[in-house]
Amino acid sequence: MKHVIIGTAGHIDHGKTTLIRALTGRNTDRWEEEQKRGITIDLGFTWFDLPSGDRAGIIDVPGHEKFINNMVAGVVGMDLVMLVIAADEGVMPQTREHMDILGLLGIQKSIIVLNKCDLVDEEWLELVEEEVREELEGTFLEHAPVMKVSAATGQGLDALVQEIDHMMQDEVEEKDITTIPRLPVDRVFSLSGFGTIITGTLRSEE
């Protein structure tokens, strides 16, 4: 069984956390403040098994501009990113900012997920997809597949899972084990009696 890391990116309230909950059955918003405000503040983590038997770990990143540092921490080391765009709003400021960050970090594999498709009619959906394609032209996302889904109703989720599984069947980029080890930090928090604690994952590729 192969382990891969996938994650989300996109504007606030475009349905990243809801999409992950629909795929995995788990809510990645753990903190009371997140649930009270209905936004993701810190990184969230969960997993699900792909049809091929491989296991996909999922990192849910914040979409709000105030938490962009947490977003950057989350996408480091991902094998695939789902750029989530709400069909009723289209490309928004944090969509573009997250696209720029993903490009700078060298993310190779991405899927464009048009979410909330249940809220718009077919004509509007075509206009949004055209807008997205124009926005992606000339970027590393230009040839990324576009999947139309609704995390609320389940529309298109099976096809999305199949696309993720298909893209992960190719060899993920081999990690360079000859350089100085680097630990992607997932979370930073304070615990009484222990002080500041960081968590992350360091794996041997040998």
What do the PLM-derived regions correspond to, one by one?
Residues 62-66, 76-97, 107-126:
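Conserved Switch II/interswitch segment of TRAFAC-class P-loop GTPases
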Residues 134-205:
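Conserved catalytic-core segments of large NTP-driven translation/proteostasis enzymes
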Residues 12, 39-41, 47-52, 73-77, ...:
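Conserved catalytic network of the ASCE P-loop NTPase/AAA+ motor domain
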Residues 6-10, 14-22, 66-72, 80, ...:
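P-loop/Walker A NTP-binding module and the surrounding RecA-like catalytic core of P-loop NTPases
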Residues 1-57:
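Conserved G1/Walker A P-loop phosphate-binding module
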Residues 24, 28, 32, 72, ...:
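Signal for well-folded cores of large energy- and translation-related assemblies
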Residues 13, 19, 38, 60, ...:
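Residue-level signature of catalytic and energy-coupling elements of molecular machines
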Residues 19-22, 94-101, 127-135, 159-167:
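Alpha-helical scaffold elements adjacent to nucleotide-binding pockets in ATP/GTP-utilizing enzyme cores
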